């Protein structure tokens, strides 16, 4: 056997081994990084009040406009792309619940904003869009900056009054359950303040903090599974799961008879 032929023959098993390794490693990686199951109990994600304005638009088959107002976790910080943000994923979820219905979800999240900053752009970012539903995510930046509201929720109520005057349904969303949030002593106080304000004002609240807390404490997911490497923002999986949960909650509340107390089914991943 000539030298060149021998070299080619000797290298053949190595090439085959390399090929096998190249095919096997991605399979192993995929198995190791399998996405967690998206699960949230119906009693945790169920909205307290029906979404009556949204229900009217569904009944008349008119275009539905939803504005997602908030800070970086609405804008999509931590996501791999804008299409992985929760408002983008929510649009997909709602179109699945209401096939043929034209639904527009506008992302009006701005990184770093607190309630006072958002109020300054309410007219342009919310009212001008003539929304049927406003999702208002708030509270996180005040917590991480140790700048708790000192007005007992007056600024939130001012924003709610403005949205209500525009005729839109409202869903508040509280902070995320993430390491850089829960380390702050005022985190729980903020969650309670938002919940108390929502109840006293008769508007809906999506309890994001509790949903994510359940992922950690009940489903035993590591923070790395649903929080970005910065320890603050959500990631693609958690934004998608948030959108799935919120989409189901909105769909149920928009179709709920006012006197109904029927529980929603669990999310099917």
Model-inferred region functions:
Residues 69-71, 138-139:
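Short loop/turn segments at strand-loop or loop-helix junctions that form parts
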Residues 88-104, 113-269:
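Alpha-helical cap/lid subdomain in secreted, periplasmic
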Residues 67-70, 173:
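Short hydrophobic segments within beta-strands
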Residues 74-78, 115-116:
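Short, solvent-exposed loop/turn elements at domain surfaces
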């Amino acid at each position: 056997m000539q030298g060149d032929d021998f070299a080619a023959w000797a290298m053949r098993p190595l090439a085959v081994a390399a090929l096998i390794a190249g095919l096997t490693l991605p399979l192993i990686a995929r198995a190791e990084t399998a996405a967690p199951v998206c699960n949230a109990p119906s009693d945790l994600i169920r909205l307290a009040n029906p979404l009556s304005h949204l229900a009217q638009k569904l009944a008349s088959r008119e275009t539905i406009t939803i504005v997602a107002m908030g800070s970086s976790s609405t804008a999509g910080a931590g996501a791999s792309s804008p299409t992985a943000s929760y408002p983008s994923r929510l649009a997909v979820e709602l179109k699945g619940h209401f096939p043929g219905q034209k639904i527009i979800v506008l992302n009006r999240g701005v990184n770093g904003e607190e309630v006072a900053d958002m109020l300054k752009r309410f007219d342009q970012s919310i009212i001008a869009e003539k929304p049927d539903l406003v999702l208002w995510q708030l509270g996180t930046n005040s917590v991480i900056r140790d700048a708790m509201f000192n007005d007992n929720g007056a600024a939130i109520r001012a924003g709610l009054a403005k949205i209500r005057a525009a005729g839109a349904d409202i869903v508040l969303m509280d902070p995320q359950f993430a390491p850089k949030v829960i380390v702050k002593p005022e985190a729980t106080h903020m969650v309670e303040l938002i919940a108390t304000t929502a109840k006293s004002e008769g508007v809906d609240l999506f309890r994001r903090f509790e949903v994510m807390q359940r992922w950690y404490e009940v489903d035993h997911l590591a923070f790395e599974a649903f929080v970005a490497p910065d320890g603050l923002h959500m990631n693609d999986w958690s934004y998608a799961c948030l959108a799935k949960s919120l989409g189901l909650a909105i769909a149920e509340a928009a179709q709920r008879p006012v006197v109904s107390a029927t529980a929603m089914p669990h999310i099917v991943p």
